[in-house]
């Protein structure tokens, strides 16, 4: 029983580490996108936003992906493009 608990705790720690790494990657990408948007002319920003939104609209997610997840992604992309980090 102790071995099972120790193994589960070890796996949990691994998952937590993976989660932290993914969070760091997302934060880094947010910073990069924000910096890029801030250094673009307004019309270039709008063109990029339109292209990204168009690409998202055309993508048909796999049936195994819940609609809520797809909507979450679309909303987050929209938020990042229209209201970048402060």
Curated annotation (Swiss-Prot):
It is found in: Cytoplasm. One of its GO terms (biological process) is cellular response to starvation. GO terms for cellular component: cytoplasm. Its main location: cytoplasm. Residues 1-36 form a coiled coil. Keywords: Coiled coil, Cytoplasm, Stress response. The keyword Phosphoprotein does not apply. InterPro entries: SigmaS_Anti-adapt_IraP (IPR019732). Disulfide bonds: none annotated. The keyword tRNA processing does not apply. HAMAP family: Anti_adapt_IraP (MF_01198). Belongs to the IraP family. Interacts with RssB. Inhibits RpoS proteolysis by regulating RssB activity, thereby increasing the stability of the sigma stress factor RpoS especially during phosphate starvation, but also in stationary phase and during nitrogen starvation. Its effect on RpoS stability is due to its interaction with RssB, which probably blocks the interaction of RssB with RpoS, and the consequent delivery of the RssB-RpoS complex to the ClpXP protein degradation pathway. This is Anti-adapter protein IraP.
């Amino acid at each position: 029983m102790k071995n099972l608990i120790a193994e589960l705790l070890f796996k949990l720690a691994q998952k937590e580490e993976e989660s932290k790494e993914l969070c760091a990657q997302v934060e880094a990408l947010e910073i990069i996108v924000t910096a890029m948007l801030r250094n673009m002319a307004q019309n270039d920003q709008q063109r990029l936003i339109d292209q990204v939104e168009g690409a998202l609209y055309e993508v048909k997610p796999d049936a195994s992906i819940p609609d809520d997840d797809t909507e979450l992604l679309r909303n987050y992309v929209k938020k990042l493009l229209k209201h970048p980090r402060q």
